[in-house]
């Protein structure tokens, strides 16, 4: 079962994405901020990390930088953001994110992306 780390400070968005991912067959570990997310990255070794860019404390770009510095191989990182301009997409790419999803995230787009990344869940709709 593919392990997904979800770092999202908005409780409703986090729980909705968690439910969607679990329905698709993923093992989900969720965090409300970057510190908690990095702790989970160290202990759960996720294959994929969905990271909100606008986190409290340190933002998603800093999470990506710190995640890449962990001893274990970093997960595939997907940026979750309300910013959709080309320069925003370029910034997430430059920060090491594999993909950029604009919130609110479309469930089918997320399923297709995870399948494209080679991490389809057993019940994936994509």
PLM segments and residue spans:
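Conserved acidic carboxylate
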Residues: 8
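Active-site residues of response regulator receiver
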Residues: 52, 81
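Acidic catalytic/metal-coordinating carboxylates
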Residues: 33-36, 59-65
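Conserved phosphotransfer cores of two-component systems
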Residues: 42-44, 66-75, 95
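Acidic, metal-coordinating helix/loop segments flanking the phosphotransfer/catalytic sites
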Residues: 30-48
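Two-component/phosphorelay signaling modules centered on CheY-like receiver
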Residues: 11-29
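The feature encodes the CheY-like receiver
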Residues: 56, 85
């Amino acid at each position: 079962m593919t392990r997904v780390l979800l770092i999202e400070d908005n409780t409703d968005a986090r729980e909705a994405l968690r439910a969607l991912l679990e329905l698709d067959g993923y093992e989900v570990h969720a965090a409300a901020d970057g510190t908690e997310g990095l702790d989970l990255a160290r202990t759960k070794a996720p294959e994929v990390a969905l990271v909100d860019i606008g986190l409290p404390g340190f933002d998603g770009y800093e999470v990506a930088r710190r995640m890449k510095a962990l001893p274990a191989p970093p997960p595939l990182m997907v940026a979750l953001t309300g910013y959709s301009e080309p320069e925003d997409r370029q910034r997430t790419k430059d920060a090491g994110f594999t993909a950029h999803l604009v919130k609110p995230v479309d469930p089918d787009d997320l399923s297709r992306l995870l399948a494209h990344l080679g991490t389809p869940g057993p019940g994936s709709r994509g």
